[in-house]
Amino acid sequence: MKYALFSVPVGTIYDLPQTIKEGEAGLVSTIGDEGLYGQACQVRTAPGGVTAAGVRLPPDVAEVVSFYGYHGYVNQRELQFVREEELWEYLGADLVLVGRATDVLSLPKVQGVRMMELERGGVLRRQPETAEEAEAHKGWAKVLLTDGRTGYVRDVALEPVKYEMTAVFSQREGLAFNDALAETLDTTADKLVPEAVARWYGGEDAFRAAVCEQAKKYMGTEYRWGGKSGRGIDCSGLVSSAYMQCGVLIYRDAKIIEGWPMHEVAFENKKPGDALFFPGHVALYLGEGRYIHSTGAAASGGVVINSLEPDDPLYREDLVKCLYAVGSVF
């Protein structure tokens, strides 16, 4: 098996080996998802190879499965291919999450040369420093890029990586995602969420609040089909990213799928941090009748807050009428 890390700030994952297809109204994009810098994927078929389905790939396109179970196709120029032992070493290092759009600089000072511009959600490997270096570089973190170069990022831009990417080693046809992740963590699928919540938040209420706050960080971001970054994000990209950054990996698209942590609960039992499902759309419930979502509606065109309550000025009747499920990881 081969592996790779996304080596560009925002990589594109296509649902087909080509970038466009014929739709009812003409040519449309085949974009399904995005991979952010430093995130891992399993390479099912190398560029130019033949897939298990018998499809010959273009010479510059690889078939991949992301560490959270999304299958697609990526141009090789957006990937840094690595050996299994290299990826294990990377995942076992001190990884940090880019908590906001930020620059990687050549020096621990604002005058440093800009090496890369990263979006929130990207992953970097923190490099160890001596006590003297840390004091001299106070306020900055020394980081390792996927190509081996070192640079510096402001400490205030970084957060701990709370999720696990190790399912990339065990994912295979016929194995549920929860079981694949549990296999590499030496636990069971039913313990994945409780263990992550206990480790990072100490309890359900704190986790729910954190998921809501992560989603709010994308307020005002434009709607982008298949997007998952501050450059543009779609409905399921918003909800799955909020959960991911809080340590729980849910299904990427706007539906509840068996084998991932989320399951349906009664509407009257909904709590902040639960997901609201509509046909082809998903939102995150914030409490008191309000929810946050990324909507392609012309009046919004991005991440906004709306309401389920008719007397709220943020009420959207069209969505309330077609709400069909509430999803929870608890």
Predicted feature locations:
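Low-complexity, Gly/Ser/Thr/Pro-rich intrinsically disordered linker/tail segments
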Residues: D311-F330
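Short, well-ordered loop/turn sites that connect or cap secondary structure elements
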Residues: S29, G35, L118, N269-K270, ...
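...with weaker cross-activation on analogous glycine-rich loops/strands in unrelated enzymes
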Residues: V248-D311
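Asp-box/WD-like beta-propeller blade repeats and closely related beta-sheet repeat scaffolds
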Residues: L91-T130
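Short alpha-helix capping/helix-loop boundary micro-motifs
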Residues: K21-T30, D103-R114, E258-F267
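Boundary regions of SH3-family modules and the immediately adjacent low-complexity/disordered segments
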Residues: M1-I13, Q18-S29, Y37-T51, R56-V96, ...
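Active-site nucleophilic cysteine motif
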Residues: A215, G227-C246
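Loop/turn positions that initiate beta-strands
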Residues: G38, V50, L118-Q127, K191, ...
